[in-house]
């Protein structure tokens, strides 16, 4: 079984989402299906069809979360040692062309959230940064073409 690297924060969020889905969302959708069933003919009952679709989405997400949680390898980011970029690193980079600075934490694929600067370890940028150190230049193939960055700092916080 392949382990999925995850921060403690990411693991907790997955557990919380699973708990909400199983204890709140699933019962609500079962209730909605029962209500829609009571309206008669199911073949033309849009309310019923919608509720069944929602149930399918919820059950699929529950299965996905249970699988991820069972395969999770929780990594204490603060205990990671070394100067090179690994899972859990908080990295500040500078775009060599625009001079724009950005900071990201490299996290597992289930906890990536670009709005909160959490970058999936499977993303092209993260893959290009892994193994590099401060002050190194790195070139990344992006949808906009080849981008060049300078690594300003690497921290494990």
Where in the sequence are the language-model features?
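Short hydrophobic/aromatic patches at helix-to-coil boundaries
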Residues: 3, 154-157
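Conserved NTP-handling cores and scaffolds of large molecular machines
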Residues: 18, 22-25, 69-73, 133
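Residue-level signal for pocket-adjacent positions within structured domains
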Residues: 1, 16, 37, 43, ...
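N-terminal cationic and glycine-rich segments that engage phosphates or anionic surfaces
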Residues: 1-63
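Non-DNA-binding regulatory cores of transcription-related proteins
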Residues: 75-149, 155
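Amphipathic alpha-helical coiled-coil segments
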Residues: 59-73
């Amino acid at each position: 079984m392949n382990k999925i690297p995850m921060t403690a924060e990411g693991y907790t969020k997955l557990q919380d989402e699973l708990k909400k889905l199983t204890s709140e969302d699933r019962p609500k959708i079962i209730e909605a299906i029962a209500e829609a069933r009571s309206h008669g003919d199911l073949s033309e009952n849009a309310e019923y069809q919608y509720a069944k679709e929602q149930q399918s989405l919820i059950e699929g997400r529950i299965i996905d979360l249970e699988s991820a949680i069972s395969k999770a390898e929780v990594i204490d980011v603060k205990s990671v040692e070394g100067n090179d970029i690994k899972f859990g690193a908080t990295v500040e980079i500078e775009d060599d062309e625009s001079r724009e600075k950005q900071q990201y934490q490299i996290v597992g694929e289930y906890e990536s959230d670009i709005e909160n600067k959490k970058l999936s370890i499977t993303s092209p940028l993260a893959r290009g940064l892994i193994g590099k150190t401060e002050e190194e230049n790195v070139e990344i193939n992006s949808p906009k073409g080849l981008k060049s960055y300078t690594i300003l700092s690497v921290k494990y916080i």
